[in-house]
Amino acid sequence: MVLRRRTLHPLSLLVQAAVLAETLALGTLPAFLPCELKPHGLVDCNWLFLKSVPRFSAAASCSNITRLSLISNRIHHLHNSDFVHLSNLRQLNLKWNCPPTGLSPLHFSCHMTIEPRTFLAMRTLEELNLSYNGITTVPRLPSSLVNLSLSHTNILVLDANSLAGLYSLRVLFMDGNCYYKNPCTGAVKVTPGALLGLSNLTHLSLKYNNLTKVPRQLPPSLEYLLVSYNLIVKLGPEDLANLTSLRVLDVGGNCRRCDHAPNPCIECGQKSLHLHPETFHHLSHLEGLVLKDSSLHTLNSSWFQGLVNLSVLDLSENFLYESITHTNAFQNLTRLRKLNLSFNYRKKVSFARLHLASSFKNLVSLQELNMNGIFFRLLNKYTLRWLADLPKLHTLHLQMNFINQAQLSIFGTFRALRFVDLSDNRISGPSTLSEATPEEADDAEQEELLSADPHPAPLSTPASKNFMDRCKNFKFTMDLSRNNLVTIKPEMFVNLSRLQCLSLSHNSIAQAVNGSQFLPLTNLQVLDLSHNKLDLYHWKSFSELPQLQALDLSYNSQPFSMKGIGHNFSFVTHLSMLQSLSLAHNDIHTRVSSHLNSNSVRFLDFSGNGMGRMWDEGGLYLHFFQGLSGLLKLDLSQNNLHILRPQNLDNLPKSLKLLSLRDNYLSFFNWTSLSFLPNLEVLDLAGNQLKALTNGTLPNGTLLQKLDVSSNSIVSVVPAFFALAVELKEVNLSHNILKTVDRSWFGPIVMNLTVLDVRSNPLHCACGAAFVDLLLEVQTKVPGLANGVKCGSPGQLQGRSIFAQDLRLCLDEVLSWDCFGLSLLAVAVGMVVPILHHLCGWDVWYCFHLCLAWLPLLARSRRSAQTLPYDAFVVFDKAQSAVADWVYNELRVRLEERRGRRALRLCLEDRDWLPGQTLFENLWASIYGSRKTLFVLAHTDRVSGLLRTSFLLAQQRLLEDRKDVVVLVILRPDAHRSRYVRLRQRLCRQSVLFWPQQPNGQGGFWAQLSTALTRDNRHFYNQNFCRGPTAE
């Protein structure tokens, strides 16, 4: 952590304030704090938990701000002066600041207050969004307004005064003001003629408002009218009178089909939306008509008379399964481009066959037909025969129909067809059933479904989305994903030679492909076989596809998980046009080809495998990728890599430009080894376990342009780490543990960066932190600088923006605490001394001198206790030769000579007494100069002479010093024991020792004796009888 620290005096606070004020005046900080300035004049204040509209600094150029977004804050009160400084604002978004009770996540009640002139100050305002706020009336609005959204509010009434004066208004959204999520007591009321004064209004949306009829006297300028999901059960010409300019009309969901509803549904009392035959006759400009989810059972051809410009018709989620096969309603819709008939199934029934009505052949302009969820089991040439000759039909959706037999060759006769979606069916192979004639269709077998509530699967899963993006520019694409295919046979694709893109993902294909499965598909360029169980062993796999450019074999892990089974990747060599290959998430780790060879492959996805284990197998797989001579992009994410050796990088293709090592377990990376990849431009190391960027630097001459080391545990970066990478443009250091960002890391290239991402790091926001100046210098290149770059310390600023520093935190904290402590001490002394002198001056004087007198005595006693010359004075009867011999040859030798550094200092009469002194003086000095007095006795019944005198002096020491220093060693355990010995054994057993008669017990005896001589006898007393001598 590199910080520029300054030693500051508290008096410098005013100086610092002046400097900071000057800095703010110069505009070095982001001008729109706490918000973020985005391109095209947008100030983004979303998700900042603001409680009021922010006031920007004087340095902010508010005249250039045209858009302000305040989504998802906590602004409950808007004042007249809130937007005065934004005179040129054109777009204002205030969604989700004070949501109504039903829409609040915790169902809190909230009411937004808007003062009368709040928006009138913005004379150029064109777009205002007040959706998802608890407002009950329309506020006063500027006449310049063009687009207004009042959806999901509590506004229940629109009258002539609500929108008076808004002559420029073109778009009005007021959806969801009264429905199950935002309930009200009745319905939204739009008084007749309330909107008639809006002469330029072209778009009106009133969905989910419990309306029972279309509002009367709407402006004739309307082009888009959306009144779906209300309670309108009847529609006649008078409901749409004078709306001759109408181009799009949505009246769907007003009489719902509840068996297919994904949300609360009320059964329609009319059983079906009642449409007058002439309801739409006068709408000659109508281009889009939505009648979905209206419980329609039949189609009346008169509904569409006069709709000569109708191009989009949505009839989904009705009961039109009979009309689809017999209707004449489509005869005059020659300009219809898109028709949606999905989920018009009969309840609990799956048809054996389906044949479209002959009137479909008149849809000569039809480009897209959606027939998902009609539920029929056989698809043959008669099913769609009236569509085959449509010259413009390019997209056909047949998902979720329970189709189990499909004659795919029929799509080869469609002249303009570009995309067929047969996913999420039950197709298991080529059609084997006898083909029914059109006449047999009416008597087709019906199968009852087990579930009465079939709900559609998501139409756009991530896998299907990626597949569609890859194939959107091809001439012919077919999606057979999520079916029941187990094997692939060439007869399935007869007459489909022009097919260029095919998806067979999410099936159960478990065969060994050998070069014969796709023979008819000579023009196929993209093949998706992900999420299957393919066996890749034959070297001729996919060789029948000479134009194949992209092959997805990901998520075919089952064969690779079979122990002992080998797999062959040599087929890649023979695919001369292949550019993109995915072997991802197959758990490939052993028994595969030791090399991948191809001159054409440019992108290889090998993520989700076991490359870490493969590279650990000696040199067997060291050259696994080296044969891909033209490889540009390699993905090795999630490969359980714990270490990456230089030779691993050295044996990657030199042509490599992108290398992804994301989400592995790398804790070390040899940066100098990047020189082995001279063309590398992008390196992704995110999600690993790097602790620091300190082992070397990026090599000189590298072409690296983007480096991502986010989501690691990086705490430090070595100086000049990035400096030599002169081509570097993007650096991602986010989600690490960095406490600072230092200029020395980058050197001169810092100004060449286009992106420097340091979000989600616990930066230390100390006064003078160097990273603040650096980030301000490159602030346009730092994503989320205003709010995403936050402090991790000190505690007062944790989790807050780096620009939220308190001026008081810029003081030198050590100096501040020192000054505080000294001043506190001075005040305390100044108060306590006079008070004590006044109240108890004499007593303090007496106690002081008393303590002063005791100090030398205490010092002397401690000094004497710490400097006693002997550990034990040994007393024994010299007249007993056996005892004397044991003392000199056993006791002395054991305690003084054989203990090494732990040797005890013994005081012996014949050796240590001073000549010239009396016996009593020597005895006194020996007892008081030793920590313990050790009595060695042969028996305890008769003690006299020196032994008796020594014992009495030891007892005298007990009385004077409160120290029990007596230790008894009895050499004959069977001798008679005196009452004193028996009492001492009861009170202090460890101070009475007996010489063992058996040699194997002598080791324990010496250990017990050492303990008795080195520890205070107070610890040996039996607490049940006595606590031992204590100091007073």
From Swiss-Prot:
Query: Single Gene Ontology BP term?
Result: activation of innate immune response
Q: Which residues lie on this side of the membrane: Extracellular?
A: 26-818
Glyco sites are at 64, 129, 147, 200, 210, 242, 300, 309, 332, 340, 495, 514, 568, 670, 695, 700, 732, 752
Query: Which UniProt key words apply to this protein?
Result: Cytoplasmic vesicle, Disulfide bond, Endoplasmic reticulum, Endosome, Glycoprotein, Immunity, Inflammatory response, Innate immunity, Leucine-rich repeat, Lipoprotein, Lysosome, Membrane, Palmitate, Receptor, Repeat, Signal, Transmembrane, Transmembrane helix
Describe the effect of Y179A: Significantly decreased NF-kappa-B activation
Top-rank taxon: Eukaryota
Q: Which cysteines are joined by disulfide bonds?
A: C35-C45, C98-C110, C178-C184, C255-C268, C258-C265, C471-C501, C765-C791, C767-C810
- Residues in compartment: Cytoplasmic: 840-1032
The places in or outside the cell where this protein is found are: Endoplasmic reticulum membrane; Endosome; Lysosome; Cytoplasmic vesicle, Phagosome
* Job description of the protein: Key component of innate and adaptive immunity. TLRs (Toll-like receptors) control host immune response against pathogens through recognition of molecular patterns specific to microorganisms. TLR9 is a nucleotide-sensing TLR which is activated by unmethylated cytidine-phosphate-guanosine (CpG) dinucleotides. Acts via MYD88 and TRAF6, leading to NF-kappa-B activation, cytokine secretion and the inflammatory response. Plays a role in defense against systemic mouse cytomegalovirus infection. Controls lymphocyte response to Helicobacter infection.
What's the protein name?
Toll-like receptor 9
Q: Which organism is it from?
A: Mus musculus
Gene from which the chain derives = Tlr9
